[in-house]
């Protein structure tokens, strides 16, 4: 019976990138986000889909993580993203429970600026939401002829190592761009 249903899967519907990003940004704005930050988050989600990372794009994450989080109050729609610690080559950013995309882009932009002076830089983000597709942030460095490396310790302890009884590792996504 299940296989019979699979024989009649409808053809996919294709949507152009720009109208989709605009629609998603409007949804985020309606959920209380600032328009410029809503558009940034929409662009990150659409970019994931455009790069074949469906698990971190619009269809999988829009409702599951982001809109649900905004509507239920566990994602702050108007965060005060700020640097809480800084040295010439490092920094820590507090995302104020906001969308991780906002703080992650800010972190990479700050790392790029610091690396122009110091040669290498590292910026950490805390107090944020679902990280999204790591490759988006890493690729920001390419525009400045730099190598980008991003990672997250997100997801909590969900991986059970071999011969263990309980989960004690995260999925810890990472991306390189060179």
What role is predicted for each listed range?
Residues 1-31:
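Generic N-terminal amphipathic, Lys/Arg-enriched alpha-helix
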Residues 27, 92-96, 121-126:
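Short glycine-rich or small-residue beta-strand-to-loop segments that form or flank ligand, phosphate
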Residues 35-46:
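Short, well-structured alpha-helical segments
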